[in-house]
Swiss-Prot record:
Pfam families: B12-binding, B12-binding_2, Met_synt_B12, Pterin_bind, S-methyl_trans. Residues 747-882 form the B12-binding domain. The gene is metH. Zn(2+) binds at C248, C311, C312. It comes from Vibrio parahaemolyticus serotype O3:K6 (strain RIMD 2210633). This is Methionine synthase. Pathway: Amino-acid biosynthesis; L-methionine biosynthesis via de novo pathway; L-methionine from L-homocysteine (MetH route): step 1/1.
């Protein structure tokens, strides 16, 4: 079954262009069906809405579907598509109809079969065929649905395979002639579908023709998951489909170039079924059948087509007109393309005879890179991604990823890293080489990559049966394969053995498995030379000669190898090692080696190796002398301190001899203030007007800074230093400008403010500096700014844009309020939203819909410039807003469709699953020093030892963990400078008392009552001082507890006398005044630095005080002896959760804490109306001592808990929703 149909269709495709039907959804919409129509009799009492479930109509309205099929066949269609676009179990879950998936697919195929057979009987000379449709599902296997967690997936490859397998079996059983995998927006979904289809074919002993059709989503020419047309083709070419095509998303005008490209590269027949143009403002398709037919006729005449049909907006009349347009037009002839290995990431990589040497990046390999191994072990995935990115930037055309290390879960690490790579276009644009000695790791990796990658590696060492089994699966996954020259006897060391093993493997793969020879890559084993063992001297020669043998005897196979192996004897002397690599590769490449696993950033050019060294290396590599190893060892020491490509540093002050404009640019880029006044004055004297110095060399220099920052070649601390230089230069010129009454032009005026109730502004300040560096005038209203003031100043100053910032969750509601007021008062300014607690989802769902003008979520300082320039550009603004609106609509749609990852439970069920603590067997520790303890003007020197520096670097957008960030190839040097500046400032803080650190803590008798905690006035426990209200996790936890903080305090009825602690600390007394002083001097760098340092001191104080409480004040861990790193990693007993954070997310609970400690009177810290702490550099929270206590996140709560909490707090529902919004709205 299947082969006969394929032969019939192929014969027709060579004679004429065949017609596929048109839009099924379009036709169904024309019937204007209501809910009861979708339900029919059978589903009249279904428990959820069914309107829109078009696939269900094959069961509830089968005659209607048959009518549509019949109309398309009458119009001239040759192939009917089954009405099963959303009929997988995954898509049917939207209607809770997963169990009906198989029945729907079977019924749909059966209906189409009946109609096709009726029409074939009418006109036997024109047989009609049924294509069983497998749609894309509503989930993506290579894209995270959560912008905050790019490694997360809401569907797995295996789940897709299972769903598609069930649908495929039913479609075949129902009578489908072909399988159509269509509207592919995520190629990994399609690879899972193809895997399922092929598996079912093998299972049932059938092989139907397969059609593949992808979707180019917009003018970028890429699928939604980011692939170009050719990359998409390469990824699925292994399916060997009857046809390859494109459908949906675009009309014929927009789709034409991609169909043309596909017709050029596809070895299969080419299909297309475009939409009837692009949707109009009402979502309708306007392209008439006649107009569409004109496009189709031109495509056909240009030789692009073998099959044509319609998608959204098309009707039987469109198909009728198309049939007339292509009648008599010669179909596209299949091209005779050269044999080549066609790989892909987001972009294609085709390796042909003429292709130069392919570099495979080796640094993302835990067995070969100590740094990468450390990053993966420490779960520093952002930095690990940077290693991959650097490999690609340095010229790697493929990256090899290996996680085989004894202390790692290699499979989990491989999946996590590959999923993260998928969200980084600079990395995922190249093909992936999945490298492991463990088959389960390789297979897990193949399930994560949408492109066509390479498996590294398989061999015959475990025998032929295992080798064949793995090879068949690799082919089904759609990957190329590296085959090691290794069999049951062992590794091939000699030239003869290398060819013998490779020839044996080649014949098995090509003749028995059917593996494409161009996808076979042999690694004939590169071994170290110059080891001092005579038997090793010819290893390089054996490899070089085996390359020529394999290329000669095994057509289309390629050669690769781990190049660094050859120089292993000289580890520690990188210069000599790279020279060996250069010489070795030179000779391998001459003999036909195609690719090599190398450090892409450390490849030396053969001709650049010093002649003396090159000759000695060639003697070793080519085994030309008996004493070659000794001669190379003799001269190797001369090169021990050299590095490939290093140059001598120029004189440090050579730039002082440059023209003044270049000196100003250099000072701005390097952040040098030493000569800026003198150089600015020299430029002023030589200028006609002082303003020319600003608008000329100074702005030219800042433009260079902006470009370098935008390209990632400068980092945020450097940009802030550049701004300091600029401000000093402008300050020198201002008196001269004022004397001449000149004023310069800016790119726009932007008002920035931290909203009412919030005191955090480091991020806002950084955005302001970056915008100033790009010639925007900034009006910074500071913190705690009421809505009325923001809008009043915006009008008075005639600003172009308003930017709002906030860190705590109540600030989100204040931002909504500002947006509503702007709408009410008919503002027409763009509104920017930023800050740690903000998100694109909240902006799209909660803010943007309250204001008709642009509302833009800006997630970092580097994006602010591009956003502002687009918003203020008459030319770019319309397209920017159109794209923004579409993006927000998508985000809202995702939010509305989002289902919780975990199943919710009732509050009663959650309470029944509280933390199980045997209170009878536990005696809570009695504090050594109960009551209040005040720490006034605390010693900063003591706190410095407790600083966690990693968040400090994150403040400056330098990602990396302290102290390893100093070794980072890109940001390490800047991090060291930043660290030095921070410590210099801390020295001043100590010497001059610039900042004051104050703190307070207290330990109080307490008992839990349900989810709450009663705190007593004294140890008699007769009078309740405060009740601490808590929330409980409310999701299903089959293997764990539903945590609540009260679980860690002994219940009142237990009779146990327990205690709870409270604390509040600040490192920021005086910080605001000092920052303002720096700003007044034009020194934004130190203004931001003092804020960042104060934040670190506050966190350090919290860490110090908690340690002191554990060891001395409470004293339950008197013998504790932890390093600062262990403190940061929370290796101690007990926790200190903070109100407003995940375990107790509701901010008003700071109120009882403030009252218990009398914080404002004792240490001068206060709370705003939104319960933000002032000074901003402050920390507060609770102390729990129980050894089982742990941190957790409350996440989403249900309505029953919302009402319970409101009742306990004495709130109405509106007030509860205000404070618990993030925990009830998602």
């Amino acid at each position: 079954m299947g082969s006969k149909v394929r032969q019939q269709i192929e014969a027709q495709l060579k004679q004429r262009i065949l017609l596929i039907d048109g839009g099924m959804g379009t036709m169904i919409q024309g019937y204007k069906l209501e809910e009861q129509d979708y339900r029919g009799e059978r589903f009249a009492n279904w428990h959820c809405d069914l309107k829109g479930n078009n696939d269900l109509l094959v069961l509830s309205q089968p005659q209607l579907i048959k009518e549509i099929h019949s109309a398309y066949l009458e119009a001239g269609a040759d192939i009917l598509e089954t009405n099963t676009f959303n009929a997988t179990t995954i898509a049917m879950a939207d209607y809770e109809m997963e169990s009906l998936s198989e029945e729907i697919n079977f019924a749909a195929a059966k209906l189409a079969r009946e109609v096709a057979d009726e029409w074939t009987a009418k006109t036997p000379d024109k047989p009609r065929y049924v294509a069983g449709v497998l749609g894309p599902t509503n989930r993506t296997c290579s894209i995270s649905p959560d912008v905050n967690d790019p490694g997360y997936r809401n569907v797995s490859f295996d789940e897709l395979v299972e769903a598609y397998s069930e649908s495929t079996r039913a479609l075949i059983r129902g009578g489908a002639d072909l399988i159509l995998i269509e509207t592919i927006f995520d190629t990994l979904n399609a690879k899972a579908c193809a895997f399922a289809v092929d598996s079912v074919f093998e299972e049932l002993g059938v092989a139907l023709p397969v059609m593949i059709s992808g979707t180019i989503t917009d003018a970028s020419g890429r699928t939604l998951s980011g692939q170009t047309t050719e990359a998409f083709y390469n990824s699925l070419r292994h399916v060997r489909p009857l046809s390859f095509g494109l459908n949906c998303a675009l009309g014929p005008d927009e789709l034409r170039p991609y169909v043309e490209e596909l017709s050029r590269i596809s070895e299969s027949f080419v299909s297309a079924h475009p939409n009837a143009g692009l949707p109009n403002a009402f979502g309708e398709y306007d392209l008439s059948p006649e107009d569409m037919a004109e496009h189709v006729k031109e495509w056909a005449s240009s030789g692009f087509l073998n099959l044509i049909g319609g998608c959204c907006g098309t009707t039987p009349e469109h198909i009728r007109q198309m049939a007339q347009a292509v009648e008599g037009v010669t179909p596209r002839a299949l091209p005779d393309l050269p044999v080549a290995c066609r790989l892909s990431g987001l972009e294609p990589l085709t390796i042909e005879k003429e292709t130069l040497f392919i570099n495979v990046g080796e640094r993302t390999n835990v067995t070969g890179s100590a740094r990468f191994k450390r990053l993966i072990k420490e779960e520093q995935y952002d930095e690990a991604l940077e290693v991959a990115r650097q490999q690609v930037e340095n010229g790697a055309q493929i990256i090899d990823i290996n996680m085989d290390e004894g202390m790692l879960d290699a499979q989990a690490c491989m999946v996590r890293f590959l999923n993260l790579c998928a969200s980084e276009p600079e990395i995922s644009k190249v093909p992936i080489m999945v490298d492991s000695s463990k088959w389960e790791v390789i297979e897990a990796g193949l399930k994560c990559i949408q492109g066509k990658g390479i498996v590294n590696s398989i061999s015959l060492k475990e025998g032929k049966e295992k080798f064949v089994e793995q090879a068949k699966l690799i082919r089904r996954y759609g990957a190329a394969v590296i085959v090691m020259a290794f069999d049951e006897v062992g590794q091939a060391e000699t030239r003869t053995r290398k060819l013998e093993i490779c020839t044996n493997a080649y014949r098995i793969l090509v003749d028995e498995v059917g593996f494409p020879p161009e996808d076979i890559i042999f690694d004939p084993n590169i071994f170290a030379v110059a080891t001092g063992i005579d038997e090793h001297n010819n290893y390089a020669v054996d490899f070089i000669e085996a390359v020529a043998d394999i290329k000669r005897d095994l057509p289309h196979a390629m050669i690769s190898g781990g190049v660094s192996n050859v120089s292993f004897s000289f580890r520690g002397n990188n210069y000599v090692r790279e020279a060996i690599h250069a010489v070795f590769l030179y000779h391998c490449f001459k003999n036909g080696m195609d690719m090599g696993i190398v450090n892409a950033g450390q490849l030396e050019i053969y001709d650049n190796v010093p002649e003396k060294l090159r000759e000695a290396v060639e003697d070793v590599v080519l085994n030309r002398r008996d004493d070659a190893t000794e001669r190379l060892l003799d001269i190797a020491a001369e090169y021990a301190d050299k590095g490939v490509g290093k140059e001598e540093d120029a004189s440090a002050l050579e730039w002082r001899t440059w023209p003044v404009a270049k000196r100003l640019e250099h000072a701005l880029v390097k952040g040098i203030t030493e000569f800026i006044v003198a150089d600015t004055e020299e430029a002023r004297v030589n200028a006609v007007k002082p303003l020319e110095v600003i608008e000329g060399p100074l702005m030219d220099g800042m433009n260079v800074v902006g470009d370098l920052f935008g390209e990632g070649k400068m980092f945020l601390p450097q940009v802030v230093k550049s701004a300091r230089v600029m401000k000093q230069a402008v300050a020198h010129l201002e008196p001269f400008i004022n004397a001449e009454k000149q004023s310069g032009s800016s790119n726009g005026k932007i008002l920035l403010a931290t909203v009412k109730g919030d005191v955090h502004d480091i991020g806002k300040n950084i955005v302001g500096v970056v915008l100033q560096c790009n010639n925007y005038e900034i009006i910074d209203l500071g913190v705690m700014v009421p809505c009325e003031k923001i809008l009043k100043v915006a009008i008075e100053e005639n600003v172009d844009i308003i930017g709002l910032s906030g860190l705590i969750t109540p600030s989100l509601d204040e931002m909504v309020h500002v947006a509503k007021e702007m709408e009410r008062l008919n503002f027409d300014l763009p509104l920017l939203i930023g800050g740690a607690t903000t998100s694109k989802a909240h902006t799209a769902v909660k803010i943007e819909q309250n204001y008709k003008n642009p509302v833009v979520y800006v997630n970092n300082a580097s994006r602010a410039v591009g956003v502002c320039s687009s918003l203020l550009s008459d030319e770019r603004r319309p397209a920017f807003i159109e794209k923004l609106d579409a993006d927000y609509e998508r985000v809202r749609d995702q939010h509305n469709r989002k289902k919780p990852r975990t199943k919710p439970v009732t509050l009663e069920q959650a309470r029944a699953n509280k933390v199980a603590i045997d209170w009878d067997a536990y005696t809570p520790p009695v504090p050594a020093k109960p009551g209040l303890h005040i720490f006034d003007d605390f010693d900063v020197a003591t706190l410095r030892k407790y600083i966690d520096w990693t968040p400090f670097f994150m403040t400056w957008s330098l990602v990396g963990k302290y102290p390893t960030i100093f070794k980072h190839e890109e940001v390490g040097e800047e991090a060291q400078r930043l660290f030095h500046d921070a410590n210099e400032l801390l020295d001043r803080v100590e010497r001059e008392g610039l900042l004051k650190a104050r703190g307070i803590c207290g330990l109080f008798p307490a008992a839990s009552v349900g989810d709450d905690i009663e705190v007593y006035t004294d140890e008699s426990r007769t009078e309740v001082a405060k009740v601490l209200r808590n929330l409980r996790q409310q999701t299903e936890k089959p293997k764990g507890f539903n945590y609540c903080l009260s679980d860690y305090i002994a219940p009142k009825e237990s009779g146990k006398q327990d205690w709870v602690g409270a604390f509040a600390v600040t490192g920021g007394i005086g910080e605001r005044e000092l920052a303002d002083e720096y700003k007044a001097q034009g020194d934004d760098y130190n203004a931001i630095m003092i804020q960042a340092v104060a934040d670190r001191l506050a966190e350090a104080f919290a860490e110090y005080l908690h340690e002191r409480v554990r060891k001395e004040i409470w004293g339950y861990a008197a013998d504790e002896n932890l390093s600062n790193d262990e403190l940061i990693r929370e290796k101690y007993q007990g926790i200190r959760p903070a109100p407003g954070y995940p375990a107790c997310p509701e901010h008003t609970e700071k109120g009882p804490l403030w009252e218990l400690l009398n914080v404002e009177e004792n240490i001068g810290m206060s709370l705003t109306t939104s319960y933000a702490m002032y000074p901003g550099a402050s920390v507060s929270g609770w102390y729990f001592s129980h050894p089982d206590s742990r941190y957790f996140a409350i996440a989403q709560i249900q309505d029953d808990q919302l009402e319970s909490y409101a009742d306990r707090k004495g709130w109405d529902r509106i007030e509860a929703e205000k404070w618990l919004g993030p925990n009830i709205n998602g």
